[in-house]
Amino acid sequence: HSLGADQLYGNLGVVAGQYLKSIVKRGDIIGCVPGRGVAGLVDNMPQLERTGLTVTQLMGSESRREYNLEVDSILHRFARKLSALPQPLYAPVLVSNAELRESIVREPYYQEAYAVMKRCTVAVVGIGTATTYEQYITGANRQPGTAAAGAAAPVGGVHSFQNSFTHR
C-alpha cells in the first residue's frame, strides 16, 4: 500500500533528523530552504542540544498564497529544535525588476543575513517531491496562471553561493 504525502514527509523527517544529529557539531551554521520536506524534518526530529548553532534561510520567501509554506514558522521551529539562533531572510525570492533587487541587496539587514548565509557549514534542502506524479510537473504547470511571469531578478538563493558544501 502507498503512504500518503504527510506520512512520507514524516518518515523522511525522522531519518533526516537522525542523520542531521550525527553530523551537526558545535558552532555550525545550518542553512535551510524551508519547504514540505524540511517541515517534515523539523516536525519529526528529536531535540538537539549543541551550543553556538545558527539556522538561516538559503533563499528568500515566496509570498503567493499557493506556495506559502510558512517559511518564518519553519525556520523558527527548526531553530528551537536545534537550540539555535534563527537568522531569517526577510526578502522575496523574486522581484519584478533589477532596480528593486539592487535596492534590497543594499539594505544593511539583507547584507547581514547574506553574510551569515555565505558561512553555512551544513545545508538542509529538499530535493524533488515525496509523491511520484508531482516530480514530473514543473511549478508553472501545477496551477494555471502561477508562472513567475515578469519575474526579472532573483534576490538571493542557493545558486549565488561562492562556498561549496561538502559531505562530512
PLM-predicted stretches and their roles:
Residues S61-R168:
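Conserved phosphate- and dinucleotide-binding cores of soluble alpha/beta proteins
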Residues H1-A98:
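N-terminal active-site beta-alpha-beta segment that forms phosphate/nucleotide-binding
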